[in-house]
Each structure stands twice: as structure tokens, then as C-alpha cells.
Amino acid sequence: MTKKYLKVDVVSPLGSVFKGEADMVSLRGSAGEMGIVYGHTELLSTLPAGVVNVRKGQHTDVLYVSGGIVEVTPTRVTIMVDDMERAENLNQAEAEKARARAKEVLKNPDASKLDIEAANKRLKEADARLKALNSSNGLYYSKDD
């Protein structure tokens, strides 16, 4: 019997930013962690900033996504995002600096509501980048912060 793979497509406003096939796609949706394999039931979910693992055989592509929407059919996973980066292209020092800057804004008692909302978003994105980096180094963890 021939192995059946999911078609995986990650798209941004600039077009397709990742295409591949997978035995399994794992990600965090609005209802929690999901493992998606060929034949999965159809679903549509929002995604927070986080890690998407696209596994085929012994190889896993680890992707940081800025958040978005995932559409699943029995044969395809389409992820629509504002931004996506492969974990191997992420810079740990930059992610840590972004995290520290966001925390500084959140500590400021004079920060406006708008500044606090933006800092919370940047903090979640920096944490997601760090998780993607850790995941690509074999240290995958999933934790709600």
C-alpha cells in the first residue's frame, strides 16, 4: 500500500511561504494542541503565535508562525499567517532582546493601554520564536504562558 501524505501549504499576504508533504502536522490551535494526519476530519481554527512542526519520515520542518488561521481537510493543511520563519533562520539573541523590550514596557506604570496591548503581542511573538528555536534543537515543549 502506498503511503499517503498530507499536502501542507503556509501562505502569507506575499503568497506561499512553505509547501510540503507530511506524515503529521502538529500545532496549537484555539482549542489546544493538535496532531493532524492524513484522513483528519475537516476543521477551521485560529492559531496564536507559535510553533508548527511538519514531519515527514525522520525529518521535521520547524516553523514559527505569527498567528493566523488553519484549515484542515482530510488531505490538506493550509495555514494562513501574517508572518512565518523557519526555526533555523531565527536569531535567538534578537528574540531575547524583543522579549526583554516587551517586558520593560509592561513594567512601566505609565504605559498606555495601546502600548500594553502591543507589548503583550510582541512578548507572545518573542516567546513563540524562542519555542521554535528550542524545538529545532530537540527541546520542544508546549506551555501556555
UniProtKB/Swiss-Prot annotation:
Q: Does the keyword Signal apply?
A: no
Key words of the record: ATP synthesis, Cell inner membrane, Cell membrane, CF(1), Hydrogen ion transport, Ion transport, Membrane, Transport
Membrane topology classification: Peripheral membrane protein
Q: Using the record, list the residue span of the signal peptide; answer none if the entry has no such feature.
A: none
Could you tell me one molecular function GO term of this UniProt entry? ATP binding
> Which terms in the GO cellular component ontology are assigned?
plasma membrane; proton-transporting ATP synthase complex
Presence of the UniProt keyword Kinase in the record: no
Where does the protein principally reside? membrane
Compartment annotation: Cell inner membrane
Domain of life, per the record? Bacteria
Name the Pfam families on file.
ATP-synt_DE_N
Query: Which CDD domains does the entry mention?
Result: F1-ATPase_delta
- Which family, according to the similarity comment? Belongs to the ATPase epsilon chain family.
Assembly notes: F-type ATPases have 2 components, CF(1) - the catalytic core - and CF(0) - the membrane proton channel. CF(1) has five subunits: alpha(3), beta(3), gamma(1), delta(1), epsilon(1). CF(0) has three main subunits: a, b and c.
| Functional summary from the UniProt entry | Produces ATP from ADP in the presence of a proton gradient across the membrane.
What the entry lists under NCBIfam families is as follows: ATP_synt_epsi, PRK13452.1
What is this protein identified as? ATP synthase epsilon chain
Provide the gene name from the record. Answer: atpC
